[in-house]
């Protein structure tokens, strides 16, 4: 359809769903980059490793893992902007001035692919299916930000934590016999950082949720027993 | 460059900045739709008029005015997701289930253009400059959501209100001799709705900001005298 697209027909099936086989060989972004000989870098982050970014010229794609995105206002304070997981991207935030920068902190073992943003834009104009994939991805990014807004719109820390657990259970949970188990371990300190609180408060609230049997811990992972009952806990605040 | 794009060369200058002349004749979206004979509808909303949307099949473009986007969870509560102004869009949020819907409430006289989302996607594939414009717009949408997160990440209502006034001054303000005047009048009730509070609290906090001369009111509009001093008020909470 466009003369610049060398193998458009080849790149259509890349964006079909494929959850079997080796993870990296079926990641839609990497499949597309590899088939079209597009250069990218891979960063492997351990838990608590932090990636600083203050330029909108690169796009970071989370291949696997989870990161907290934070805006750091120089000499003042930090604001947690989002919790991103496998398939999410960051880096395409505008830069206003020198008064702040962004950082991404891994909350689990995380692999990130990094690519120049101009390369992505060029790929969009050269390959219509990739362009559609990218447009849909950007719409999904806004939706993801709105999910985070639903968590922190609560003023009460108990409501924020219950909302976060519900979102994690929905997006990063696996059904087990007595509820939904989170796919990763998460420290009280990280939970506090996400919801803008402190470790002590989070430990106290989790102890209460455990006592009232709304959650339990198994193999160091949180299990949400009943999303309905937990969501009622939010409204009762 | 692509055989489907009838007048690609013509549509390039549409996306250049043009702030002179009649507003609607130089709106980039309308210019593009009109030149390419793309159908759209215009809705004129008065203050407090509400537009319900529970489908992601249409894109709404704010031609002029301001709206609050709210997620309404059936039988339970509402969450304000964002404050959108001239040039912003909404509607492209995913629909998960029947437990909620979205509404957009005008906080000022507002004109909205509405177009089928499939038409936008088709236009993207037919016209490369429009596609680039739309991709940049979607990136901007995420950034806008992050601005809102910065406001409601505060647990204190005073900090949320001060953050909101700073954002409004930056994005919807005009420099006057003694500070930055907001471009529209806004009621205490609407301010409360945006930050998840009530009218009484907002009135009390605004009275305090007036008393300490951080803001003043002129022609029913709020003037922020010093963004620096007001931002310090946030940190002191």
UniProtKB/Swiss-Prot annotation, chains A, B:
It is found in: Plastid, Chloroplast. Residues 188-207 bind DNA. Keywords: Chloroplast, DNA-binding, Plastid, Transcription, Transcription regulation. It holds the Pfam family cNMP_binding. This is Putative HTH-type transcriptional regulator ycf28. CDD domains: CAP_ED (cd00038). GO terms for cellular component: chloroplast. InterPro entries: cNMP-bd_dom (IPR000595), cNMP-bd_dom_sf (IPR018490), HTH_CRP (IPR012318), RmlC-like_jellyroll (IPR014710), Tscrpt_reg_HTH_Crp-type_CS (IPR018335), WH-like_DNA-bd_sf (IPR036388), WH_DNA-bd_sf (IPR036390). The keyword Glycoprotein does not apply. The keyword ATP-binding does not apply. Residues 155-228 form the HTH crp-type domain. Its main location: plastid. It comes from Pyropia yezoensis. One of its GO terms (molecular function) is DNA-binding transcription factor activity. Gene3D superfamilies: Jelly Rolls, Winged helix-like DNA-binding domain superfamily/Winged helix DNA-binding domain. SUPFAM superfamilies: cAMP-binding domain-like, Winged helix' DNA-binding domain. SMART domains: HTH_CRP.
């Amino acid at each position: 359809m466009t003369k610049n697209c060398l193998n458009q027909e080849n790149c259509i099936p890349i964006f079909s769903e494929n959850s079997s086989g080796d993870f990296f060989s079926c990641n839609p972004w990497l499949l597309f980059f590899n088939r079209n000989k597009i250069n990218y870098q891979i960063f492997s982050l351990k838990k608590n490793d932090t990636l600083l970014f203050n330029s909108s010229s690169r796009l970071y794609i989370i291949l696997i893992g989870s990161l907290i995105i934070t805006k750091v206002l120089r000499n003042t304070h930090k604001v947690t902007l989002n919790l991103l997981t496998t398939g999410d991207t960051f880096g395409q935030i505008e830069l206003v001035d020198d008064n702040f920068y962004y950082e991404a902190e891994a909350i689990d073992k995380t692999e990130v692919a990094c690519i120049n943003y101009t390369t992505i834009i060029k790929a969009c104009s050269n390959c219509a299916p990739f362009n559609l994939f990218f447009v849909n991805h950007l719409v999904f990014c806004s939706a993801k930000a709105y999910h985070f807004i639903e968590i922190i719109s609560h003023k009460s820390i108990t409501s924020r934590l219950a909302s976060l657990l519900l979102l994690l259970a929905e997006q990063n949970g696996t059904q087990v016999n007595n509820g939904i188990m989170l796919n990763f371990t998460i420290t009280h300190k990280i939970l506090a950082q996400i919801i803008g609180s402190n470790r002590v408060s989070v430990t106290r609230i989790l102890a209460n949720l455990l006592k009232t049997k709304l959650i339990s811990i198994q193999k160091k992972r949180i299990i949400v027993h009943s999303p309905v009952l937990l969501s009622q806990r939010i409204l009762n605040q």
